[in-house]
Amino acid sequence: MNQNLPFQQQQRQFLHYLRQPRVAQLPAGFAPERLSVYADLLYNKFDESLAACFPVIHRILSPTDWRILLLDFIADHRCLTPYYRQIPDEFVQYLQQERDRTNDLPFLAELAHFEWIELQLSIAESESITSKPLTREQLLSGVPVFASVMQLLHYQWPVQDIGPHALPAEPPATTGNCQNNCRLNS
């Protein structure tokens, strides 16, 4: 009972073409122009979402390198979630665990993780710790309270400083002072 029905075979060919339109064989029964529209829609939707979630990566990569990265992600990664809003998390997992990093910027996976956590924390719901500013006396006599939404992260690369004009070629030497710790909170 493990046979593929003809429509299932056609669906698999269609999906294979959408994932790899440059190399996949055109499925029978489809007009090339129509398939091209679907492939472009898929790429554009991923581009729109991931460029918004990873703005630094989008800015530091050339348009060609960004396009190659997204096309590789679409072709190679099998998302485990049907939810569109979780695609950026899948993208980070792809960069960390699946992608051949030989030709990538050496800090790409760490930067993607940093940008994704930063975005998640910025939109996370949290209760205000105080409704009014504290006086100096209250600050000194009170018990410190951490923000309810916070992450302490450590990276090999100074991801919080990376941008179009700050692209390190080597990770900084560690001096024992944990200089690449990042505290993120909303």
Predicted regions and their residues:
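N-terminal, charged low-complexity regulatory/assembly segments
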Residues: M1-E125
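Hydrophobic packing positions characteristic
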Residues: A75-S186
